[in-house]
Amino acid sequence: MNDDSETPGAEAWMALPLFNRKASPDHEQNVLTWFECWRPPEDDVSDFKSLEDYEDSPTHSIGSSGLHSGSLDSDYHYYTASDLVFSDDGGVGRNADLLSEISDDHIPQLSFSTPSTCPFPGCKSTALFTTGRDFRRHYRQHFKRFFCRYEECSQSTNDPGDAGKKGFATRKDRARHEAKHNPAIRCQWRDNNGDQCTRTFSRMDNMRDHFRRIHGKE
């Protein structure tokens, strides 16, 4: 058999770029990186009230992260609350180590036949969840995979001794935080000479609040 022969599609497969960790903006800053080997099933858009909810959903947020194509649905398993084995020391395991590998793409699928509380160990929330959307949004806050990309920021690294208190659950939360390092929204108020207010803000609502409180009486 000729060594140069290739099966159909092999050349195209070989041309696919490998995932470049160094080029990734989240290099060495994602607590739970094992999900790079998995491709979760797509959510039905009808499960979400708005496009924003869909884009922020746990499974959809990694759709363009360079995962290899191909379905692994036969190997994919949604963990249920019964899979979480709570230990006396406050830890949790799926026969010991579930949380060491679980990502926010593997969230307990509660039945919601009755209002349910969060099963995450140590969760202090008293909220009762009646829909999967609200529960998923809450539950993934326990897994903060994104960290500030400004090195001097206290939110830029994950401190094992302070787990769960640093970082952000979604890219949107991180982007909102990072905007504070480089506020670019300038107050639009001008005085009688046409000179503009010098205050800048990272959020439009904060600028409007400033405008209303400070300049509204002028």
Curated annotation (Swiss-Prot):
* UniProt organism field: Trichoderma arundinaceum
Q: Which residue intervals make up region (Disordered)?
A: 154-181
Q: Does the keyword Cytoplasm apply?
A: no
Principal place where this protein is found? Answer: nucleus
User: What name does the UniProt record give this protein?
Assistant: Trichothecene biosynthesis transcription regulator TRI6
Which GO cellular component term is one of those annotated? nucleus
Comp. bias (Basic and acidic residues): 162-176
Question: Where exactly are the zinc fingers annotated as C2H2-type?
Answer: 185-215
Entry keyword set = Metal-binding, Nucleus, Transcription, Transcription regulation, Zinc, Zinc-finger
- Per the record, what phenotype accompanies loss of this gene's function? Blocks harzianum A production and reduces expression of the trichothecene biosynthesis genes, as well as of mevalonate biosynthetic genes required for synthesis of farnesyl diphosphate (FPP), the primary metabolite that feeds into trichothecene biosynthesis. Leads to increased expression of 10 of 49 secondary metabolite (SM) biosynthetic gene clusters in T.arundinaceum and reduced expression of 5 SM biosynthetic gene clusters.
Q: Where in the cell is it found?
A: Nucleus
What role does this protein play? Answer: Transcriptional activator of part of the trichothecene biosynthesis cluster that mediates the production of the antimicrobial trichothecene harzianum A (HA) that plays a role in Botrytis cinerea antagonistic activity and plant defense priming. Regulates expression of both trichothecene and mevalonate pathway genes.
